[in-house]
Amino acid sequence: IKLIAQGDMKAFEELYNKTDKAVFGFIFSILRNKANAEDVMQDTYLKIIPASKIYNPQGKPISWILTIAKNLALMSLRSEKKTNTSIDELENNIEFSQKDETEDKLILNLAISKLADDEKQIVILHSSGVKHREIASFLNMPLSTVLSKYNRALKKLKKILEGD
């Protein structure tokens, strides 16, 4: 982050390459719309450059980035006056980035959409490479709660997928 503050675009590119999947997954879990999530993701990374000058390295950079992303995603929701999206709306709004996506991935995405919001965020963040401790810190939950919600979500996914 210090290198980015000094104008090092290679450091910025490296940060982007290491965090883009987790950031997009997290934003998408909030907005539930691919196009809006892409817009907020772009805004997040654009905000990182000037904000890097005031970055306080007390925590992990991913937590800082996800905080920026969360704030921008919530601002986006407020501007659209969307406060609650039903699961039916969520399933109708899911847009997939590739037409050649496998049927298994489609089924998994639908199964994940049936999880509670906090479970969905934990599963998406962890599958994007974010450690449970970082998720706990970011979501302001005890580690034990994150672990139990993650395990409960996996059991729900297994039940959903075996039922289909």
What are these regions (language model features)?
Residues 5-14, 24-43, 138, 143, ...:
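Short, charged helix-capping/linker segments at alpha-helix termini
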Residues 50-57, 67-87:
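Arg/Lys-rich amphipathic alpha helix in sigma70-family domain 2
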Residues 5-6, 32, 43-60, 79-80:
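Sigma70-family region 2
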Residues 102, 112-119:
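Short helix-coil-helix linker/hinge
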Residues 25, 39-46, 50, 59-71, ...:
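Structural recognition of an alpha-helix C-terminal capping motif at a helix-to-coil junction
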Residues 75, 81-105:
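Internal acidic/polar
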Residues 74, 133, 139-164:
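DNA-recognition helix of helix-turn-helix
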Residues 122-123:
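A short pre-motif secondary-structure segment
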